[in-house]
Amino acid sequence: MKFAILFGGNSYEHEISIVSAVVLKKVINQNLEFIFCDEERRFYHIPSEKMNSKTFSTKAYKKEKELFIKQGGFFSKGFLKENKLECECVINLIHGRDGEDGKIAALFEFYSIKFIGPRLEASVLSFNKELTKLYAKSVGVKTLDYTMVRKGQNSKEKLSFPCIIKPARLGSSIGISIVKDEKDLEYAKDVGFEFDNDLVVEEFKNNIKEYNLAGCMINDEFVFSIIEEPKKKEFLDFEQKYLSFSGHNELIEANLSEELKEKLKDSFKKIYNPLFKGALIRCDFFILDNEIYLNEINPNPGSLANYLFKDFSTTLNALADQISLEKMIKISYNFLHSINGQKGKL
């Protein structure tokens, strides 16, 4: 299977998406194409040998072929004709806005482009933390209690401390603050409101454990990664979350009982099926007093969480093989023809 990796986007996580693509280039041992979406949402075909940080930080990518999207794929302008970029499946590796909020999913579905990544409905529900909590509750997965704080509205709910404040629509740890007492609350809210008009506030739990589990569905069977217990400080910050996914060090599976492992996998299944079919996702869970709570869904995890899988390439190819395009509706115009053949034409 020949893949094209789409990365970049107009997102706060633009640079991290570049790092993610460079890492994945080293992991996937097969022929790849690279499509860069810059901050103006223009697409460029990046040669494999130029997949490095300098190409993007110096804007040298603008010297490469610009691509445009239309029915069936990505194309570049040739001397006499348009040239289609040869690939069988696109990997959506744009983190945050554009890649995880549904824009790319809608674009690919509209233009009949086969891709690995969350579909439109899955993107919308996983990108907004408030909607994620409501969705998790609907499928029987617990989340921590929360309060919504909205810009321009005076919240009447009394907050307890310490608490953690998160922008509702941001696919990373950006804009998150731990507030230990009321005197720090307004500053933390101001930080969060720089990124979103809606904030999720949760009670901060000191004795909570976090575990990550990635997976996908292939031919109606779940394929799981190992379960990871990330090393962290008070919470998983931006650098920890994204600069540790290159897989240079061998991961050791979390030391959990078989009962808790099965509980985590069962919660993952409830979240994934059927909404996230076609995507390889990572769910971040909390365990508190032997109870499982969903923290967040990562629909496009850093470098597709390759470091958590024992045979990532095989999993990726098998996932791509079973993805099918939406069936096009045949328009016959019979109704309009019938009107046209009658008196009093439309």
From Swiss-Prot:
Recorded coiled-coil stretches: none
Cofactor: Mg(2+); Mn(2+)
One Gene Ontology biological process: peptidoglycan biosynthetic process
Annotated binding of Mg(2+) 1, by residue: D284, E296
Gene Ontology CC terms: cytoplasm
Subcellular location: Cytoplasm
MF-aspect GO terms: ATP binding; D-alanine-D-alanine ligase activity; metal ion binding
Residues the record lists as binding Mg(2+) 2: E296, N298
Enzyme class (EC, first level): ligase
Domain ATP-grasp: 133-327
Cofactor binding, per record: Binds 2 magnesium or manganese ions per subunit.
Involved pathway(s): Cell wall biogenesis; peptidoglycan biosynthesis
Record's catalysed reaction(s): 2 D-alanine + ATP = D-alanyl-D-alanine + ADP + phosphate + H(+)
Binding-site list for ATP: 159-211
InterPro entries in the record: ATP-grasp (IPR011761), ATP_grasp_subdomain_1 (IPR013815), D-Ala_lig_Van_CS (IPR000291), D_ala_D_ala (IPR005905), Dala_Dala_lig_C (IPR011095), Dala_Dala_lig_N (IPR011127), PreATP-grasp_dom_sf (IPR016185)
Pfam families listed in its UniProt record: Dala_Dala_lig_C, Dala_Dala_lig_N
HAMAP family assigned: Dala_Dala_lig (MF_00047)
Function: Cell wall formation.
Family: Belongs to the D-alanine--D-alanine ligase family.
PANTHER family: D-ALANINE--D-ALANINE LIGASE (PTHR23132), D-ALANINE--D-ALANINE LIGASE B (PTHR23132:SF23)
Protein name: D-alanine--D-alanine ligase
Organism: Campylobacter jejuni subsp. jejuni serotype O:23/36 (strain 81-176)
Taxonomic placement: Bacteria, Pseudomonadati, Campylobacterota, Epsilonproteobacteria, Campylobacterales
Gene behind this protein: ddl
